[in-house]
C-alpha cells in the first residue's frame, strides 16, 4: 500500500501562480438553499457561482509569482514574517467543560483597534496601555499570551457575550497544535470580522493545551474527540437559540469540524460550515509526509515537534504519577492517557515522523494497536456522507502536507449538502498573493457573508 521514499513530481506542470477553481459535482448537483426574502431556491453550487464569483467553476486567481509551487507557498506561510500583517486583537475567555477540563476562546475585538490606537500601516498600537490592561486581567499562574491578546475582564466578557443578541457567530477551529496566533488564523479572523462592516462576531476556539491554554484533566485533543466543540456550540446555541452560528475549520481543525458535522447529522446547530485544506484521510496524509521526500524533509519533523512541544509545555498536568495503574481498559469512548511519562517525552523529542508520536501517545490512550488504526478511525472522510448542512470545501491538488489523494471526490459527488472546490494551486492553507494576503481566507469570508445575508 505504502511507497518507499520517492521524489515528488516537481515539474513545470506543477509550477505556477495563476490558479483555477474546479467544482466537483454529482449528477444530481447540490442541495437547494431557500432565500430569506422570497420563495426562490437555488442549488448550493449555483449560489456560490452567483454570489461568490471568485469561487465559481473555472474562476482564476493569481498568487505570488515567487511562490510558484505548493511547497514554497506552504513553507513561506510557516516560516515567513507576518508580524506586521493581520493586526487582530483578541479577548480571551477560559472555557470550562463538564469533565473539568478547559480550553480558551479568543474573541476578535475590533473595537480595540480604536481603544489601543492601532495604526495598521505601521503595525503599531498603544502597547503601554494594552500592557497595563493585560496585567490587570491576567489570571495568576497562566502563561503569558501572544501579541495583541489579553484576558477579558468580567465586565468586558459580559459585554462580549451580549453581542449574541445582535450578531451571528463564526467559530474558527485551528490546525494541529496551533491556535489563534497563527498567521493564517489571524488572516481568517480579520477577513471574517470585516465582512459587511463587522456583521459577524468571530471567535477562535483553542484546543486543550494549545495557544498557551492549560491542560487540567490529563486529557489532550485527538481527531476522534469532538466533545469540546459540541459542548461549546451547544452552549452558544442555548444562550441565544435564534442566533445563526457558522464554523470554519482549517487543516486538522477542518478534520475535527467535519467529523463533528458528520456525527451530528440532521441535529447540527450550525447553519453552514467551511472546511479548508482538510486532511480527509489521515493514512494518506501520513503516507505523503513519510514518503514524499520534500514533504518529509520540510514538514514532517516540524509537525511532529509541534505535537511534542504541546505535550512538553503541559507535562506537569499530563504526566502520570509513578506506579500509575490504569483504572479501566482504554477505549475511544473512555480514553486513558497513561503513556504521558518523562521517559516517553524524551523519546518523542527525537521523533521525526508523526506516526511515531501517535504510536506512543495517541493510539494507546484509546486502546488502539497503533497509530495507523487511529488514523483510519479518525479520518473525516468516513463521516462526510452524513454531513447535512451546507458545507463549502476547498482543497488544493498541490498540497504538500496532505497530497491530492486525500481529496474526497467520490464522497463529495454523493453528498448534495457539500460543494467541493478543487484548486490546482495554493499549497496547504497558504494561497498567498504578492502582498502576502491569503486568497483562501477571503473565499471563506465571502461565502459566509453572502450566505448569512441571503439564505433563510
Swiss-Prot record:
The positions flagged as active site in the entry are 251 (charge relay system), 399 (charge relay system), 428 (charge relay system)
One GO MF term: monoacylglycerol lipase activity
Q: Which reaction does it catalyse?
A: an aliphatic alcohol + acetyl-CoA = an acetyl ester + CoA
Q: What keyword terms does UniProt attach to this protein? A: Acyltransferase, Hydrolase, Serine esterase, Transferase
Name which cysteines form disulfide bonds: none
Q: Which residues form the AB hydrolase-1 domain?
A: 168-434
Gene Ontology process terms (BP): medium-chain fatty acid biosynthetic process; medium-chain fatty acid catabolic process
The Enzyme Commission number assigned here is 2.3.1.84, 3.1.1.-
Mind telling me which Pfam families this protein's record contains? Abhydrolase_1
What protein family does this chain belong to? Belongs to the AB hydrolase superfamily. AB hydrolase 4 family.
In its miscellaneous comment, the UniProt entry states:
Present with 573 molecules/cell in log phase SD medium.
What the protein does comes down to: Displays enzymatic activity both for medium-chain fatty acid (MCFA) ethyl ester synthesis and hydrolysis (esterase activity). MCFA are toxic for yeast and this enzyme could thus be involved in their detoxification by esterification.
Q: What name does UniProt use for this protein?
A: Medium-chain fatty acid ethyl ester synthase/esterase 1
Q: Which organism is it from?
A: Saccharomyces cerevisiae (strain ATCC 204508 / S288c)
Query: Which lineage?
Result: Eukaryota, Fungi, Dikarya, Ascomycota, Saccharomycotina
Amino acid at each position: 500500500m505504502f511507497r518507499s521514499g520517492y521524489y515528488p513530481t516537481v515539474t513545470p506542470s506543477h509550477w505556477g501562480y495563476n490558479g483555477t477553481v474546479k467544482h466537483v459535482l454529482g449528477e444530481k448537483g447540490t442541495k437547494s438553499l431557500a432565500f430569506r426574502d422570497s420563495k426562490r431556491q437555488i442549488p448550493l453550487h449555483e449560489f456560490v457561482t452567483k454570489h461568490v464569483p471568485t469561487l465559481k467553476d473555472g474562476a482564476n486567481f493569481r498568487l505570488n509569482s515567487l511562490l510558484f509551487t505548493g511547497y514554497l507557498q506552504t513553507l513561506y506561510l510557516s516560516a515567513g514574517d507576518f508580524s506586521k500583517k493581520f493586526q487582530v486583537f483578541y479577548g480571551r475567555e477560559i472555557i470550562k467543560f463538564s469533565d473539568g477540563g478547559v480550553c480558551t476562546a479568543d474573541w476578535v475585538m475590533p473595537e480595540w483597534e480604536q481603544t489601543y490606537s492601532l495604526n495598521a500601516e505601521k503595525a503599531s498600537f498603544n502597547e503601554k496601555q494594552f500592557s497595563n490592561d493585560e496585567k490587570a486581567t491576567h489570571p495568576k499562574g497562566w502563561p503569558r499570551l501572544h501579541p495583541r491578546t489579553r484576558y477579558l475582564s468580567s465586565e468586558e466578557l459580559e459585554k462580549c457575550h451580549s453581542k449574541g443578541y445582535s450578531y451571528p457567530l463564526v467559530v474558527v477551529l485551528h490546525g494541529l497544535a496551533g491556535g489563534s496566533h497563527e498567521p493564517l488564523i489571524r488572516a481568517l479572523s480579520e477577513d471574517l470580522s470585516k465582512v459587511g462592516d463587522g456583521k459577524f462576531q468571530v471567535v477562535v476556539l483553542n484546543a486543550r493545551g494549545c495557544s498557551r491554554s492549560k491542560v487540567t484533566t490529563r486529557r489532550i485533543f485527538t481527531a476522534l474527540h469532538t466533545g469540546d466543540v459540541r459542548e461549546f456550540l451547544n452552549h452558544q446555541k442555548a444562550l441565544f437559540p435564534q442566533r445563526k452560528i457558522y464554523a470554519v475549520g482549517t487543516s486538522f481543525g477542518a478534520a475535527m469540524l467535519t467529523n463533528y458535522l458528520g456525527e451530528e447529522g440532521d441535529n447540527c446547530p450550525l447553519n453552514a460550515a467551511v472546511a479548508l485544506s482538510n486532511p480527509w484521510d489521515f493514512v494518506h496524509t501520513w503516507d505523503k509526509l513519510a514518503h514524499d521526500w520534500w514533504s518529509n524533509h520540510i514538514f514532517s519533523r516540524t509537525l511532529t515537534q509541534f505535537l511534542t512541544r504541546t505535550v512538553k509545555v503541559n507535562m506537569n498536568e499530563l504526566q502520570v504519577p509513578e506506579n500509575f495503574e490504569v483504572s479501566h481498559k482504554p477505549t475511544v469512548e473512555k480514553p486513558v492517557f497513561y503513556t504521558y511519562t518523562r521517559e516517553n517525552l524524551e523519546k518523542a523529542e527525537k521523533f521525526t515522523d508523526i506516526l511515531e508520536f501517535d504510536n506512543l501517545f495517541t493510539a494507546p490512550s484509546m486502546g488502539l494497536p497503533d497509530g495507523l488504526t487511529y488514523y483510519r478511525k479518525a479520518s473525516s472522510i468516513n463521516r462526510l456522507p452524513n454531513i447535512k448542512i451546507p458545507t463549502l470545501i476547498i482543497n488544493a491538488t498541490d498540497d504538500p502536507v496532505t497530497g491530492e489523494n486525500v481529496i474526497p471526490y467520490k464522497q463529495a459527488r454523493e453528498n448534495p449538502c457539500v460543494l467541493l472546490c478543487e484548486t490546482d494551486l495554493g499549497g496547504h492553507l497558504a494561497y498567498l498573493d504578492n502582498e502576502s494576503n491569503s486568497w483562501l481566507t477571503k473565499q471563506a469570508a465571502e461565502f459566509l457573508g453572502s450566505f448569512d445575508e441571503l439564505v433563510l
